[in-house]
Design a protein with these regions (language model features):
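Hydrophobic/aromatic ligand-binding patch that stacks against planar heteroaromatic rings
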Residues: 17-21
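Electrostatically charged, flexible surface regions
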Residues: 43-143
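Short, conserved loop/turn and helix-capping segments at secondary-structure boundaries
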Residues: 11-15, 44
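Glycine/threonine-rich flexible loop motifs
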Residues: 3-12
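Active-site-proximal beta-strand/loop segments in catalytic clefts of secreted hydrolases
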Residues: 1, 31-34, 72
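General secondary-structure edge motif
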Residues: 1-2, 117
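Glycine-rich phosphate/pyrophosphate-binding loops
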Residues: 22-45
Length: 143
């Protein structure tokens, strides 16, 4: 588990599967759950959130070569007061901001050392939406 936000879409196997399906003309969606490191996944809650997303995108049109990328927020940051306490689903663009370039030398070699949650983000894009406690729904293109 983990988010596939922003530039993660270029590295993610989850997103690659949806992208490959789109290449073959299939409707597809990649779903990821951002969460704190020590937090266990609440599969019942995640299933409920995904069911809401699927109901929403079922009626939306995708152009050839498009697919959906969905990021569920950390339940600890999801706002209360929505239907069933569930977070809103917000359509947004994928954030193009690069990760911070911070590496630490260790006995095993160089390791990326930037803080994932403190990554750069643009307001209204998937990283900010998901980190703000809402479900980020992004339309992506294969090429």
């Amino acid at each position: 588990a983990g988010g596939n936000l922003g530039v993660d879409v270029h590295l993610s196997g989850t997103v690659a599967a949806a992208r490959e399906a789109a290449l073959h003309g299939r409707r597809s969606v990649a779903v990821s759950q951002y969460r704190g490191r020590s937090q266990a996944i609440d599969w019942e809650r995640a299933s409920r959130w995904v069911a809401r997303v699927l109901a929403r995108i079922d009626s939306l049109t995708l152009e050839p070569g498009e697919f959906w990328n969905v990021n569920l927020p950390d339940p600890a940051t999801a706002p209360e007061g929505h239907a069933g306490g569930d977070p809103p689903i917000i359509e947004c663009a994928v954030d193009p901001s690069p990760f911070a370039l911070l590496f630490n030398e260790t006995p095993a070699g160089w390791v990326w050392g930037a803080n994932y949650h403190e990554r750069p983000r643009r307001p209204g894009h998937d990283v900010a939406i998901c980190f703000g406690g809402s479900i980020a729904l992004s339309r992506c293109r294969v090429v």
